[in-house]
Amino acid sequence: MQPRVLLVAGLLVLLACAQAIEAEDTSLLDKMQDYVKQATRTAQDALTSVKESEVAQQARGWVTDSISSLKDYWSTFKGKFTDFWDYTPKPEPSSS
């Protein structure tokens, strides 16, 4: 009779350990999900602050000004050399 009681007690201990491990796994998964959510929020906040920062706005202004200057330069260049690109020979008078 004692071996049966010992066997039942051992099985109960194993079941209790299995439930504890399963509870830990669920808890660990929840902690990881919370960590990922917090990291995502932190990254989004950092990106927002960078976008709104004075340095970023100044850099955007420099890029916009540079692109505008480049467009102006290109239109001036194109205007000066358009005669070369649109060259159509004048018809020569026929000598008949």
From Swiss-Prot:
Annotated region (Lipid-binding), positions in chain: 68-96
Tissue distribution of the protein: Synthesized predominantly in liver and to a lesser degree in intestine.
Signal peptide: 1-23
GO terms of molecular function: high-density lipoprotein particle receptor binding; lipase inhibitor activity; phospholipid binding
A Pfam family this chain is assigned to: Apo-CIII
Matching InterPro entries: Apo-CIII (IPR008403), Apo_CIII_sf (IPR038195)
A biological-process GO annotation: triglyceride catabolic process
Example of a GO cellular component annotation carried by this entry: chylomicron
Compartments, as annotated in UniProt: Secreted
Family: Belongs to the apolipoprotein C3 family.
PANTHER family (UniProt xref): APOLIPOPROTEIN C-III (PTHR14225:SF0)
Protein name: Apolipoprotein C-III
Origin organism lineage: Eukaryota, Metazoa, Chordata, Craniata, Vertebrata
Gene that encodes the chain: APOC3
